[in-house]
Amino acid sequence: MKTSRLPIAIQQAVMRRLREKLAQANLKLGRNYPEPKLSYTQRGTSAGTAWLESYEIRLNPVLLLENSEAFIEEVVPHELAHLLVWKHFGRVAPHGKEWKWMMESVLGVPARRTHQFELQSVRRNTFPYRCKCQEHQLTVRRHNRVVRGEAIYRCVHCGEQLVAK
């Protein structure tokens, strides 16, 4: 999905949130960090990614469109926090104490590492596997690891090894 397919109102709301949180951080930190580049090119099940070297935030347009309010409230500050931590502290753990501090104390947003958005529309192919108690859907990546003999997956409920159907 290209940026042009995202309604302009959603793009504007994303920019408002980004600028609001950046201004808040600059004020609290006594700095003048620049506005990062923003693109809507993230694919797959990730809501967004922060690219440190290029100082860029990439957002998933499908998840943004399907979860606009929560996405703008949580994901935009989450990715901005990664860039601000990198500028402020240098290279540290991605969701470490510095990031948590930046999220909660500086940006005033709960520090959650993962989103809870429905992923059905962005999931690619899955492969059916079975155990004693249920059927599981493995991602392409996990399926390929099983095929290459690089991984064995077990059911979290019964503990049995998953077998392709």
Swiss-Prot record:
Superkingdom classification of source: Bacteria
The SprT-like domain covers 20-163
The family database entries (PROSITE patterns) matched by this protein are listed as:
ZINC_PROTEASE
Cofactor annotation: Zn(2+)
Keyword Ribosomal protein tagged: no
Free-text comment on the cofactor? Binds 1 zinc ion.
What name is this protein filed under? Answer: Protein SprT
Query: What is one term from the GO cellular component aspect held by the record?
Result: cytoplasm
The family this protein is said to belong to: Belongs to the SprT family.
Gene Ontology BP term (one): response to stress
Q: Do you know which InterPro entries this protein is assigned to? A: SprT-like_domain, SprT_Zn_ribbon, Uncharacterised_SprT
Ordered alphabetically, the record's keywords are:
Cytoplasm, Metal-binding, Zinc
Active site (catalytic residues)? 79
Which residues participate in Zn(2+) binding?
Answer: 78, 82
Listed transmembrane segments? none
Q: What is its main location?
A: cytoplasm
- Give the source lineage, highest ranks first: Bacteria, Pseudomonadati, Pseudomonadota, Gammaproteobacteria, Enterobacterales
Keyword Magnesium on entry: no
As for subcellular location, the record says: Cytoplasm
What does the record give under GO molecular function? zinc ion binding
